Amino acid sequence: VDDETMYEILSRLKELGGIAGVHCENNGIIQARLKEVLKTKGGRKDVSDYPWTRPKEAEAEAVSRLLKIAKCVDTPVIVVHLSTAAGYREILRAREAGQTVYIETCPQYLVMDEGKYSLPAEEARHYMIAPPLRKKKNQEVLWQALKEGRIQTIATDHCSFTKEQKMAGAEDFSKTPCGMPGAEERPALIWQFGVNENKITAEQMCIYLSENPAKLYKLYPWKG
């Protein structure tokens, strides 16, 4: 989505009393790095190159740009499936300046890291999601943000594909459909790695998985 279209979407949602949930990655950076991998390596079969093509800077820049557009429109937004500390810092800066910004993250960014992309290619492709899994240090920042109530929801970005569909990227990882399942596993993962490990409370888990999403999307108190 180009900036003009985003401005128009946010403006219309403001008129309707709605709110946008926006995936934030700079596609120009991604496309340039995909070309660079092809040029330097002569192919894109090595899945371990995948996270390099979608760096944390691509997320942080897109978050920053979205928030500036939202400020021009004077409307709140939701940054969905936040995966990096860099993107989180952009949101904190906007909040400090008075903007209303909500954050969603997902279990995959809380419990897995980019080491999955060093597995054998057939297995590694199963973990190709967008944004990609990140370095482990980002998990600590996201968990702390959840503990402090600075992240509002934990969703899944559920988008499942079969093994056969993932094989579309066997010769070129950029052809792999990005996504993985998560809706069924989300409560168990957050309970085990969040509540049982004392990173968040059981009450917070209920707020992030149920109450806050219902409030953000105007389903409360019928849901949540």
Positions of PLM-derived features:
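Histidine/acidic residue-rich metal-binding segments in metalloenzymes
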Residues: 1-154
